[in-house]
A protein has these predicted regions:
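RNA substrate-binding interface of SAM-dependent RNA methyltransferases
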Residues: 11-106
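Conserved sugar-transfer catalytic core signal across GT-A, GT-B, and GT-C glycosyltransferases
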Residues: 40, 130, 163
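Structured adenosyl-cofactor binding patch, chiefly the S-adenosyl-L-methionine
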Residues: 4-6, 43-47, 61-73, 135-172
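Residues immediately flanking
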Residues: 8, 30, 125
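Short, structured interface segments
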Residues: 1-11
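Active-site/ligand-binding-proximal alpha/beta "capping" segment
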Residues: 99-151
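Generic beta-sheet signal
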Residues: 2, 24-26, 118-124
Length: 172
């Protein structure tokens, strides 16, 4: 067998530093399933995002399923774990434009937005979507079209992947 010890990396919001002028970050509120977190990390790493911010975490990011599902993304992308309030203060302080994945009367199609600036994309919980903390702000809500007649939602990591890659496509 193989035994190793590693130093745990910092997961503090204040330790996030961006090398690009217009960073792209993904914010995930209260994720519960380690596999979804890992899949989001994998996609965020593949898309070359600048960070993943997890608010009000409901499981451990060090869960084996999270690390396994990330396929190494866990070790390659900066991760911050904080409260909703801390995340919101950070995004405002650093002047991010914020897009929330949300279906309501103000929601616009995700592909009609401009993600080329300093951008944060915010996803809600697997079961309930975004809390009032994110809904009650003046952020731009975006939605994915779902013309199918049976399914009205997508898996968290699938929705996140679509939104991340639209932002990446626009930045080329």
């Amino acid at each position: 067998g193989l035994v190793a010890t590693i130093r745990m990396k910092s997961n503090r919001l204040e330790d996030l530093h961006f090398s690009r002028q217009n960073p792209l970050v993904l914010v995930v509120e209260s994720p519960e399933k380690p596999g979804n977190i890992g899949a989001l990390l994998r996609t965020a790493c593949a898309a070359n995002l600048d960070a993943l911010i997890i608010t009000d975490l409901r499981t451990s990011i060090y869960n084996a399923n999270c690390i396994r599902a990330s396929l190494g993304g866990f070790f390659a992308i900066p991760i911050a774990v904080c409260s909703n309030e801390e995340s919101l203060a950070f995004l405002r302080q650093h002047r991010f434009q914020v897009f929330t994945a949300l279906i309501d009367e103000r929601s616009a199609s995700y592909d009609k937005q401009d993600y080329r600036g300093k951008t944060a994309i915010v996803l809600g919980t697997e079961a309930y979507g975004l809390s009032d903390h994110w809904r009650q702000n003046d952020f731009q809500p975006v939605q994915l079209p779902m013309p199918g007649q049976v399914i009205d939602s997508l898996n968290l990591s699938v929705s996140g992947g679509i939104l991340m890659y639209e932002a990446v496509r626009q930045r080329k």
